[in-house]
Amino acid sequence: MNIQSSIDKNSIKAVNNLNALLCISKVLNEDIVNITDIHLMKKGMTNRSFYFQCRGKKYIMRIPGEGTDKLINRKEEASVYRAIAGKDLSDRVLYINPVNGYKITEFYRDARMCDAHNKMDVKCCLERLREFHEMKLQVEHEFDLFAQIEFYESLWQGTPSGYSDYAETKSRVFSLQQYINEYKEEYCLTHIDAVPDNFLILSDGSVKLIDWEYAAMQDPHVDIAMFAIYSLYDKEQVDNLIDIYFDGYCPKEIRIKIYCYIAVCGLLWSNWCEYKEKLGVKFCEYAYRQYQYAKDFFDIVQRNLIN
């Protein structure tokens, strides 16, 4: 049989990857002609994903994006999915390839992403995040924030940052490491990419955390910082987020530590964005705001330490 001729040309155009279609066929044990209604989802910051149907059931397939092979260790990602298996935390993963990063999951009808500006959405998602943290799951790899900043910078291959004060900003951010280490109380599996888009609220009100590719051992409070900076929260919104997570009581030292994480994670994702932009992927306002978090929250930390 000529496989190429048996596939809907629109499907090939939507996926732009025949290997992905062959993978779906093998995983679902279905003839490739039964893979229908393929259409791209909104392109993510790290990956490209698409919906498809097979015999009336919907699925999602992820294909890693530009330069992702340098950013994500797919074997470590697979180990995370093994660690969370049976915990009812994630969407249902039917297939994950630890080499090329292909992933197939079931599609949840009537599910929606968390709205970072809806208080009830944020509350239920932060409660679920805290429940995950309290499980204190373990894996064998870690996500070292400061080492990753250096790593992303190394991917620039000697080209300078687009920010003229980068060296000064980096030095200031790295000076926060001592305070962080002093108040780092927990160390467990942390999502790392716990942004609103990665919380699915199902029709029954339950919450699933998806896209665990950055997950690793870390201080779980990093996830609070990540949620805040992706949402582009101002300081008042950050404080409200912290209060929701801690149910109204967060010790001052821990709050300041989270401010530190916001500065550190801002620089981390700014460097990540600079790498992706060198590959032709533009983030514009988001990238600029991440760099500003590094600067602004360093200043906020200093003011809080003085008072």
Locate each region found by the language model:
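Regulatory N- and C-terminal appendages and interdomain linkers associated
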Residues: 1-33, 295-307
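ATP/Mg2+ or Mg2+-diphosphate-binding catalytic cores
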Residues: 9, 271-307
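An alpha-helical support segment within catalytic cores of ATP-dependent transferases
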Residues: 13-32, 36-37, 137-192, 197, ...
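ATP-binding pocket architecture of kinase catalytic cores
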Residues: 39-145, 161-167
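Active-site acidic catalytic loop and adjacent metal/ATP-binding pocket
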Residues: 42-56, 60-61, 177-224
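Activation segment
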Residues: 66, 110, 207, 215-217, ...
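Extended, well-ordered alpha-helical scaffold segments
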Residues: 123-124, 165-176, 241, 283-297
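Active-site activation/catalytic loop segments of kinase-like enzymes and analogous catalytic loops
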Residues: 221-250, 263-281, 293
